[in-house]
Amino acid sequence: MPSSENSFTNKLVQLGSSCLQVTPICLGTMTFGEQVDEPTAHRILDFAVERGINFLDTAEMYAVPPRRETYNATEKIIGNWLAKRPDVRKQLVIATKIAGPSRGMDWIRNGSADVTEKDFLEACDASLKRLQTDVIDLYQIHWPLRHVPAFGGVYFDPTKDKPVTPILAQLQALDKLVKAGKVRAIGLSNETPYGVSEFVHLAEKHGLTKIATVQNPYCLVNRTLENGLDETMHRLGVSNIPYSPLGFGLLTGKYDKSGLIGEGAPANARLTKFEQNRKQRWGRPESLVAARRYNALA
């Protein structure tokens, strides 16, 4: 058992209006199956649980950076770990995500530009099978079906809008999963204030399951959440699950001297190893400049 000094179990937080109670620290797993092999991933999971952490987050798309060869790998690794530790499952809150439209990943639902009700139901069943569990505690939409300026984007471009499954139909599909006992609570990720408001108001209007959470990036080098999403979540009773709280490692200080690439850069670090990650929000020169200044204050 974890010692009381290291345990987080006495600080449980309720997720939105759901029944889920989680530790303030959630173990993100998106590197499992890419940078982290299965035996190492299992040791990390053991380490977290031994210290009282009860909250795990994954996704059908993982590992990252996304590749055809590692699609679904993270859920499978977690499922294998759970199978070897059957008594652990009841202690945990396991969150996973259904991928949104393909964004160039043609190995996800054949590159479809939409996610239908059938896709929601089939994706959930597939995640349950990979995770080797009979229920997903928190099922999230990884990114919106409609066009939004996500993953480092800033400005909304209405000319990029395309017809997709309406938010009401998405809610109805998720509600079916809850009523079927396959999902306990639902959430969103990489969402906007508009999207959160629509999901909440339509759920209330039609008597459907209300979203409990929004998982968006939030840290000292990415504060876009403060541009209205924080107020929206507060007033609508939706919890925030901030991801990348250390800015993909920028706020650890490991890039301060060397920069992201070149001599002295940490060879196995994500922003050094994967160009795709540098091209998005975390590899921008201004992000590293800001991180260095924050790290100097720490």
Regions found by a protein language model. Name each.
Residues 16-35, 95-111, 140, 144-154:
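N-terminal small/glycine-rich loop or linker at the start of catalytic domains
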Residues 36-48, 116-130, 196-200:
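Short, acidic/polar
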Residues 44, 74-81, 123, 127, ...:
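A general structural detector for well-ordered alpha-helical segments in enzyme core domains, enriched
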Residues 36, 40, 69-73, 77, ...:
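Alpha-helix N-cap and loop-to-helix initiation/capping positions
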